[in-house]
A protein has these predicted regions:
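Beta-edge loop/turn motif
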Residues: 75, 286-287
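Beta-sheet entry/capping signal
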Residues: 138-140, 282-285
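Conserved pre-motif I regulatory segment
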Residues: 247-284
Length: 287
């Protein structure tokens, strides 16, 4: 990925860290979590729940799948600030040598998720997202490390703002073919959508930060890196019992029945009696 150039420094997003042991760039971790969120949506949620979500948001399943990947991939955009990046000694030296270091004094802890919430509200506003939707989806990202005390910290530096723009565009290209859109959200849908999206994000981030994906930096350097991560995600979900069991319905009465009177429960017997009284012969409905 090409870096942006501002003044005398030449750095790119692949040099900014999201994880340090082992190193993962913000782009690698973002793509990993985005793919995991998509796989959780497609494989963990029951088909009926997916259909209900699509109906609530008025979109097709492939559209919401793309959006979920894009949205989840941006969850750590708040780490793209000098005050966070400089927490790692090696990065602080690099920032100093590139005149990117900004002194920071604050007695409270820096919470990257809260910073990310504020960054995304502004970015999505610029991209034309509806106010209710952008506030909700940014707010969910702001809660993905729920319960932690600390502050959102934005240093409003032009080079770092360029990093934010580049990161958002990179994730949009990766998951949404560079086309921005955000589903509309009605007031009475906010609670259900918040619970579902927050759950998917927390689970995806937890899995993506674990040992099963510690080599994601190497995987994404391969030509088929995306496919490998999808397979790895499916394997993790399957081995750990996260996949929904498919519900199969018989298309032949003979496979499922008949239910004989002597083995029928009370409801079955009542149905039999109704059919007998109105003298209808043939197939029998049963529960």
């Amino acid at each position: 990925m090409a870096g942006f150039y501002y003044g005398d420094f030449d750095m790119n997003l692949q040099e900014l860290w999201a994880k340090t042991e082992p190193f993962q760039s913000v782009t690698t971790h973002g793509i990993t979590v985005g793919i995991l969120a998509q796989e959780i949506f497609l494989k963990y949620l029951a088909p009926g729940n997916r259909l209900l979500l699509c109906k609530l948001l008025g979109v097709e399943q492939h559209q919401i799948t793309e959006f979920i990947g894009y949205w989840a991939s941006l969850h750590d955009i708040g780490k793209i600030e000098c005050c966070f990046q400089s927490k790692h000694p090696g990065m602080k030296d690099k920032l100093l040598s590139n005149d990117l270091y900004i002194p920071f004094i604050n007695g409270n802890a820096i919470r990257h998720e809260k910073t990310g919430k504020e960054i995304l509200k502004d970015l999505w506003n610029t991209l034309g997202a509806e106010r209710r939707a952008r506030n909700l989806f940014a707010g969910i990202i702001g809660a993905h490390h729920q319960g932690k005390s600390g502050d959102a910290v934005r240093q409003f530096s032009a080079p770092w703002h360029q990093f934010h723009l580049e990161f958002e565009q990179s994730m949009r290209q990766h998951f949404m073919n560079d086309t921005f859109w955000m589903p509309s959200v009605l007031p009475d849908q906010k609670g259900a959508i918040c619970a579902l999206f927050l759950g998917m994000l927390i689970l995806a981030d937890w899995i993506g930060s674990g040992a099963s994906f510690q080599d994601a930096e190497f995987i994404l350097s391969q030509a088929d890196g995306n496919a490998i991560l999808e397979q790895r995600a499916d394997l993790f979900l399957s081995k750990n019992g996260f996949l929904s069991d498919p519900v199969s319905w018989s298309d032949r009465f003979a496979v499922s029945g008949p239910i004989f009177r002597k083995t029928a429960n009370g409801l079955h017997r009542q149905i039999w009696n109704i059919f007998f009284k109105i003298r209808i012969s043939g197939f029998v409905c049963f529960c």
